[in-house]
């Protein structure tokens, strides 16, 4: 009888202990959710690093034609440092691609060639923003900005690089198609379609004046796209 009682008590203790352990152990779903949050946090941190570095390349692409020599030197130095700081976190093949653009930036600066400088900066910008994932503002918006930088640098080259301007327009059209369906604001849709059409028509006519006007509108509209998506 005593053995039966002891056995029963022991069994009760074991069951209670197992129940407590089960209550404390994370369920597979909880573990999956925690892992998902961790991965999202890691990607958010990576996105922040990439976009922060990309800003210096963006500034260089925008100001390559207008900055004073001292300002340009400062912009180049900042882009170079930003690129070097983020490069170690990039995939191996991308590291080489970014290094190539950093080298091209320095060579263009030494040669006093603002169009090549702007183009290299734009390519560096493209490399970085293309690696972002799951951002509130789609990477396609940043790539539309890149297309505008490239088109503008081609336009200001001597001689004007009309063929590459057409390639830049086609790239922009591809990016626009990937996100235009997400935009419910009809006026923004219409304006952006118009800007891209005008950019292409300017190339067909080889009209520098029309091209300059169209690409300015495109880049202004990219800013509006950024605001639109950030508020969604």
Where are the regions a protein language model picked out?
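Immediate post-signal-peptide N-terminus of mature secreted/exported proteins
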Residues: 25-81, 88, 137-142
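Mid-chain, structured segments of secreted extracytoplasmic proteins
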Residues: 80-120
């Amino acid at each position: 009888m005593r053995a039966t009682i002891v056995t029963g008590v022991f069994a009760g203790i074991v069951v209670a202990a197992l129940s407590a352990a089960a209550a404390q152990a994370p369920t597979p779903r909880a573990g999956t959710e925690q892992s998902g949050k961790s991965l999202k946090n890691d990607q958010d941190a990576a996105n922040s690093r990439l976009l922060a570095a990309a800003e210096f390349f963006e500034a260089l692409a925008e100001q390559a034609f207008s900055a004073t020599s001292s300002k340009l030197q400062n912009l180049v130095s900042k882009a170079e440092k930003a690129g070097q700081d983020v490069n170690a976190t990039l995939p191996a093949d991308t590291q080489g691609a970014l290094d190539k653009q950093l080298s091209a930036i320095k060579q263009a600066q030494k040669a006093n060639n603002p169009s090549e400088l702007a183009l290299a900066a734009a390519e560096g910008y493209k490399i970085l923003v293309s690696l972002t994932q799951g951002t509130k503002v789609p990477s396609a918006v940043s790539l539309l900005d890149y297309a505008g930088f490239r088109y503008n640098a081609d336009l200001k080259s001597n001689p004007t690089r009309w063929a590459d301007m057409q390639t830049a327009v086609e790239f922009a059209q591809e990016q626009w198609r990937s996100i235009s369906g997400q935009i419910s604001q009809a006026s923004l849709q219409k304006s952006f379609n118009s800007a891209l059409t005008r950019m292409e028509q300017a190339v067909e006519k080889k009209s520098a004046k029309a091209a300059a006007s169209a690409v300015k509108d495109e880049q202004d509209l990219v800013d509006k796209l950024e605001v639109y998506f950030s508020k969604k």
